[in-house]
Design a protein with these regions (language model features):
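ATP/NTP-dependent adenylation/nucleotidyl-transfer catalytic domains that generate, transfer
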Residues: 170, 231-233, 287-324, 328-620
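Enzyme catalytic cores with a strong preference for nitrogen-chemistry domains
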Residues: 1-321, 332-343, 348, 368, ...
C-alpha cells in the first residue's frame, strides 16, 4: 500500500486556506498513485481555537467542509481531522450540542465502513488531554463518553475501518493524537486495535513540539511494543507543522511525521524542521531518516515567522530595544533570520549608567545584521520625570523606583517608535527574569511577542553560540557569552540591567535556571519537594549539585536564604507575568496558559517551617 503523508502547516481559523492546501496535496497524491492520503488532527480549522469552538456559525463552516473533502475522495482514500457532532438532542456537559474531535475516512465519495458498520467514516478521539495548555474537555466529548451514553462497548467504539481498493482489503485502525499517549487513561485504543488484529494504525496529531518531544514519543512507541510484542502492528504518525497559538502561548509544531515498523523502528520520516511536506511511502520499502540539529533555534525562527504571517498580516516593522546585552542581541538575530533585516528596527536608549562597551556592542550587532539602527539618550526624559515627581512632593527620587523610571521610559519610547513606524515591539525578557519579576511593568514587559520568554538564561547563551555558528560570524559578541564548565561560569561582561552604577543581575545563573524549570515543568514540583531533597542530602545527586556548591548553597543557611528570596520573588511577580506578552513555548512548562497561576502570596505552612528549621539546625 502506498500512503501519502501530508504534514500540513495548519492556519488557525483560516478554513479556506487549509482546504486549498489540502486539495493541492490530494491532487498531487492521486498523480503519484497513492492509495491513501493522511492529514493531521483538526487540519481544517486548527486545533488551538479556544472559544471559537463554541461559535455555531464557525462550527457550521467546519462541518460543511467534511462533505466537501469527502467529495474529493473519488480516486483516493482521504483521512483527515476535524470536528463533528452527534446526539444533538442529548447535549454536551455545557448545555450546547455535542462536539467531537474526529478522524474522518472517506473513499469514492463515501464514508469508509467499519467492521461493525457503526459510525462509518468516523472515529472519535477517546483520550482528551486537560493538562498544560490542553483543554479538550471544555470543547469536546470523548469517544468514551459516546460509548457510555449509547451503551456501546469500547471494542465496538474503537473498531477497524475496512478499506478496499483494487480488490485488496486492508483493516486500518484510526487514532487521534493523545490516544497514542494513553498510559494515564482508562482506555488504550492502541491495545484494542492490536486485539482486533488490524494491519496497521494511523494516528493523526496536532502535537506541539517542546524540547526532546521526539524522544518522549519514541519512548511511548517502545512501550507499546514491549506490551504487545510480536502482536504489535506498524503505526503511521502524521503530525502538523508550523505555529498555532492560544492567545498567551505561541506553540510550534515540528512535523516529524513518522512510519514505525511493528518492532518500533523507523521505516520512513518526513522533515522535523517545522516545515510543510507531503511524500508518498510504500509500506513494503525502507527509507533514509534524518535528525534536525539546532532544533531550538529553528523552533524560535519558525515561531516568529509564522506569528508574523498568520497574526500580523499587515506586515509591520519589528521594533526592538538594543541594549548591548545578550537577550536583545539574540532576539534581533532571530528576527532577522525569520523576517529579514529590512523588517527590523533597533533602538539604543542609553542613560548615564550604560557603559560605552554595551553601546558599542549594540551598534556592532545592528551593523553586522544590516538592521536600521538609532541611538539616543533618555537622560532628558529621566530628568523631566524627576522634576515632575518633585512637584508632587517626592524628593529625592532614588532607589528601585528611580531604576523603574528608566525602564518605563524606554517602554514609552519603544511604544512611540512603534506607533510612528507602524510596527510592533519584540519583548526581550527571558524565562528566569519572568519567573523572578526582574522586569518593569510597562517597561521591559511590553511587546507583541516574547521569543525568549520560555528560554532560561543558559539556553539563551547556547542560542547565541548557535546563531554565531549559523552566520559563521561573531554576530553575538563573545564577551556576552560566558565560559561554562561544570558548576562554574565566567563572564567577559556579566548580565546587567545597567540602571545604576556597578549593577549586576542578582540571579544565580545555572542554579536558578534549573530551579525555575523544576518548579514549572509538567508535572511540576513545589518548595516542599525541594526542601525534602535538600534535607535528605539527595540534592548532591541532582544535575544541579555542582552549581549549588559553586554558589555556596551547600551551606544550609545560604540555601534557605536563597530559596526564600526565590519564592518571594516568584510569587510577587505573578501580576507581571499575567500581563506578559504571548510567549513562544519550547519547554514542558511555560508561563501563560500552560502553567496557570492565581495571584497567591508566598506563605510557608507548618510543614515547610518545620523542615526549614530542621535544615538550619544542620540535621540533614
Amino acid at each position: 500500500m502506498k500512503i501519502a503523508i501530508a504534514q500540513l502547516n495548519i492556519r488557525s481559523g483560516q478554513i479556506d486556506h487549509n482546504l486549498n492546501s489540502m486539495k493541492q496535496k490530494i491532487d498531487q497524491a492521486v498523480l503519484d498513485q497513492a492509495d491513501i492520503i493522511v492529514f493531521p488532527e483538526m487540519c481544517v480549522g486548527g486545533y488551538l481555537l479556544s472559544d471559537l469552538f463554541l461559535q455555531k456559525s464557525y462550527i457550521s463552516q467546519l462541518l460543511k467542509a467534511n462533505d466537501l473533502i469527502k467529495s474529493w475522495s473519488k480516486d483516493i482514500g482521504i483521512i483527515w481531522g476535524n470536528i463533528s457532532h452527534f446526539d444533538e438532542l442529548k447535549g454536551n456537559r455545557d448545555g450546547r450540542y455535542n462536539r467531537y474531535n474526529t478522524a474522518f475516512f472517506a473513499y469514492q465519495g463515501e464514508w469508509v465502513k467499519k467492521e461493525n458498520n457503526h459510525l462509518n467514516g468516523h472515529y472519535f478521539k477517546h483520550c482528551l488531554p486537560d493538562y498544560r495548555f490542553f483543554d479538550d474537555s471544555r470543547y469536546f466529548k470523548s469517544g468514551m463518553d459516546y460509548a457510555l451514553e449509547n451503551h456501546i462497548e469500547l471494542k465496538d467504539s474503537i473498531n477497524p475501518f475496512i478499506f478496499e481498493k483494487d480488490h485488496q482489503i486492508t483493516r486500518i485502525g484510526l487514532e487521534v493524537c493523545e490516544d497514542l499517549w494513553s498510559k494515564d487513561y482508562n482506555v488504550n485504543p492502541t491495545a484494542i486495535y492490536v486485539d482486533h488484529k488490524v494491519d496497521f494504525i494511523i494516528n493523526i496529531s496536532s502535537s506541539p513540539w517542546t524540547l526532546n518531544k521526539e524522544l518522549s514519543r519514541e519512548k511511548r512507541i517502545k512501550e507499546h511494543v514491549q506490551i504487545h510484542g510480536d502482536k504489535m502492528v506498524p503505526l503511521v504518525y502524521v503530525n502538523a507543522c508550523g505555529m498555532q497559538n492560544n492567545g498567551k502561548n505561541v506553540l510550534v509544531f515540528d512535523g516529524d511525521s513518522t512510519i514505525y515498523q511493528k518492532d518500533g523502528r523507523v521505516l520512513a520520516q518526513l522533515n522535523d524542521d517545522f516545515n510543510e511536506d507531503c511524500q508518498v511511502f510504500d509500506l513494503k520499502q525502507t527509507y533514509q531518516t534524518h535528525i534536525t540539529h539546532n532544533k531550538l533555534l529553528n523552533a524560535l525562527v519558525v515561531a516568529i515567522r509564522e506569528f508574523d504571517q498568520q497574526v500580523l498580516t499587515f506586515k509591520p516593522k519589528w521594533i526592538i530595544g538594543l541594549s548591548g546585552g545578550i537577550d536583545s542581541s539574540v532576539n534581533v538575530a532571530l528576527l532577522c533570520m525569520a523576517l529579514g533585516s529590512d523588517r527590523v528596527i533597533g533602538y539604543n536608549m542609553a542613560s548615564r549608567y550604560n557603559q560605552a562597551k554595551t553601546k558599542n556592542i549594540a551598534y556592532e550587532t545592528a551593523k553586522k545584521l544590516n538592521v536600521e539602527y538609532y541611538a539616543g539618550s533618555i537622560e532628558q526624559l529621566v530628568q523631566a520625570t524627576e522634576n515632575t515627581l518633585i512637584e508632587y512632593n517626592i524628593n529625592p527620587v532614588e532607589g528601585l523606583a528611580y531604576e523603574n523610571i528608566q525602564a518605563r521610559l524606554r517602554g514609552h519610547l519603544l511604544s512611540s517608535f512603534a506607533s510612528y513606524k507602524g510596527g510592533v515591539i519584540c519583548n526581550n525578557g527571558n524565562k528566569v527574569e519572568c519567573a523572578l519579576g526582574y522586569a518593569t511593568l510597562y517597561g521591559d514587559t511590553i511587546g507583541a511577542l516574547s521569543p525568549l520568554g520560555d528560554c532560561t538564561k543558559l539556553q539563551v547563551f547556547e542560542l547565541a553560540k548557535s546563531i554565531n555558528d549559523y552566520y559563521q560570524d561573531e554576530i553575538i559578541n563573545q564577551n556576552l557569552i560566558p565560559s561554562i564548565t561544570e558548576g562554574k561560569i565566567e563572564f567577559g561582561f556579566a548580565p546587567s540591567a545597567e540602571l545604576r552604577d556597578n549593577q549586576i543581575d542578582p540571579m544565580k545563573w545555572g542554579y536558578h535556571d534549573w530551579l525555575v524549570q523544576y518548579f514549572i515543568q509538567y508535572p511540576s514540583h513545589n518548595i516542599l519537594d525541594w526542601l525534602k531533597i535538600y534535607q535528605s542530602g539527595e540534592w548532591r545527586k541532582t544535575e544541579v549539585a555542582s552549581w549549588m556548591i559553586y554558589y555556596g548553597l551547600d551551606n544550609p543557611k545560604a540555601f534557605i536564604e536563597d530559596i526564600r528570596w526565590f519564592m518571594k520573588s516568584w510569587h510577587s511577580a505573578i501580576f507581571k507575568r499575567i500581563q506578559f506578552p504571548p510567549i513562544v513555548t519550547i519547554s514542558r512548562g511555560s508561563f501563560g496558559f500552560d502553567y496557570r497561576e492565581s495571584q497567591i502570596p508566598y506563605i510557608e505552612n507548618h510543614e515547610t517551617k518545620e523542615l526549614i528549621e530542621t535544615i538550619l539546625k544542620g540535621e540533614a
